[in-house]
Amino acid sequence: MIKNGIIELHELLYNGSVTCSDLVNESIKEAHNLQNNCNAFVTIIDDAKNDCKSDSILCGIPFGVKDNYSTKGVLSTGSSNTLKDYVPFFDATAVENLKKCGAVMVAKTALDEFGMGGTGTTAHTGVIKNPWDKNRICGGSSAGSACSVAAGVYPFAFGSDTGDSIRKPAAYCGVVGYKPTYGMISRYGLFAFASSLDTCGVFTRNVRDAAIVVDAMKGIDDKDQTTWDSSDIKLYENLNNKVDGKKLFYISELVDINNYSNPSDELKKHLEEFHKLILVCKNMGMKVEGVSIDKTLLDAIPSVYVCISCAEATSNMSNLTGLIFGPRGNGVNVVDMMKDYRTKGFSPLIKRRFVIGSYVLQKENQERYYLNACRVRRLIVDKFKSLFKEYDGCIMPVGSGVAPLISEVNNTITDNDVNVLENHLQIANFGGFPSITIPSGFINNLPVGLNITGDCYKDQDVLNIAYAIEEKLNYKNVIARDYNE
């Protein structure tokens, strides 16, 4: 039963075919099964129950929460040894909003440490494996959430997206990953990584469920001054597939196979299928055009992201000292205790990011690196803002193919000719744009994804376009096969 969508589960609850306890118990059982095979969780809440009486469509529905959201009375580690025993005394606003609807949190999902990674291999609990092929990654940082939704543990899970941390894992795991407009959902209680980029979002197995969940998560919050009043936006109520006349663009340089030296067969197939999807969109009544963007601007995207995100992370995580929370470090004085705590607690990947962040924020380097990165970010955002005046959205393939093998993962910063194709989703974080990934097919029996990004506050348009394409392709509600074999 639990592998159904939200509407179907609500109907079963409403007509008395099942109880909330039935769904929760089944979800917990599936979670343990998945944990034994794919290592998707930090905590499974075996005594989870519904204490709320609500007429919400989400009442009684189990869900998962990425472990960088604060959850009252439940371990919240950020998948880091620095917070391995941290139990918050409050809920993140997004979690609180779902609890008010009567939804039941049954698990905290594993992630790349503090959300700083794109592989799902740096959690303090170990590598999170892809439910479609346990030799492959889920992507990151929201690996556990993507994995568990794909495996059918529950119909939705929370993620967070700073560069592509919802949308890339969604593609690799064959589910929907939705990052709303920046500020639609409160970040209060979300462990800060890069505050100008961080966005709360959701994984589901269809676009409709994504609309339902974000309707419940969103809202203005006096504890997060970046939130805005979205009360007049009813994503689920206004969801439709009427896309005739909509205009989309894609970045020509990134989807032209001739621009890649020695392209793999997988990349060739991925781009070939993307161009077929463009024809599908045109046959649906949409106008889709290629747009050329200055290569210098495109090539700058990964570097700008690294510079800004590392700088903000270095500042945000300066409070992780081992003195206020987390395991106490050893030392004869405060400085030695802090040094011991941070040296032992953070992984090498996190330390590298802090080194970069500290370097670009040094007084003598700020102008050359950090401030210039902020200026280039503005140029990129302005370019896309101008395009969104003419077009309803940008349509692009996600990444360069299927999920990589765990054995081939390299957690260092790389530079190759697919680098921008792998990282173009970061544009949505630069501008706070709404962006959604949906399953678009399979290559070698592994899922790949399609992304739609639109202008700020145009979430309804983005969801409607994704919904229409989803209805046409019919890759929704797919459960990952063979994860327990």
Question: Model-found features: residue ranges?
Answer:
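Conserved hydrophobic/aromatic pocket- or pore-lining residues that grip, position, or stack substrates
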Residues: S27, K66, L98, G126, ...
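Short, well-ordered alpha-helical
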Residues: M1-V87, D91-A92, F114-M116, W228-N241, ...
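Short, surface-exposed loop/helix-turn segments at secondary-structure junctions
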Residues: N81, T227, Y305, V332, ...
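General small-molecule cofactor/ligand-binding pocket signal
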Residues: V106, K287-D294, I436
